[in-house]
């Protein structure tokens, strides 16, 4: 691996370490990692700070993934898919294990989403992933499960559409596996029947309101 690719990973990791949830929480005198699900992502920001702050957190997390994957390789004259994928991985790792916040961050979903916008080949897969995420959410109410299903659907859709195990296929597969890892506590709580649900968005509850 060249020195420029290593530098891309390092700079992307440092960019990913800028945690929207923790920074926004400081303006509210809240350590988001000690509230709700103890996670620094947008979902916990919604639970603990409300929708406006959650949207700000989501924007920061998504954009830093896009910035790292799109601009850092370009600035270092390594504007290839390989460089962009390495930058993407660096940013996601930075979000989950932020250098500036004692390596305790979010679960990487928003940042990973931001990286996907850099690859035109994944455009339709983003739509498929969102549809699967939304469908899972309104039927189950579990955001963590929705994120896992979305990640898996992106990788499966790419493989089915392209029928090749190229760099982007490997990246999408690795991303979906990593989502399962970062949501392992959610999976455990779901198995125990203790996972929090967003019941307001569940389709069964929407029908009940209209009865």
Predicted region positions:
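C-terminal ends of transmembrane helices
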Residues: 21, 26, 92-104, 132-140, ...
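Cytosolic, membrane-interface loops and tails of multi-pass inner-membrane proteins
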Residues: 22-52, 188-211
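Short, non-helical or kinked segments that cap or interrupt transmembrane helices
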Residues: 31-42, 100-113, 142-150
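Interfacial segments of multi-pass membrane proteins
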Residues: 46-49, 72-76, 90, 94, ...
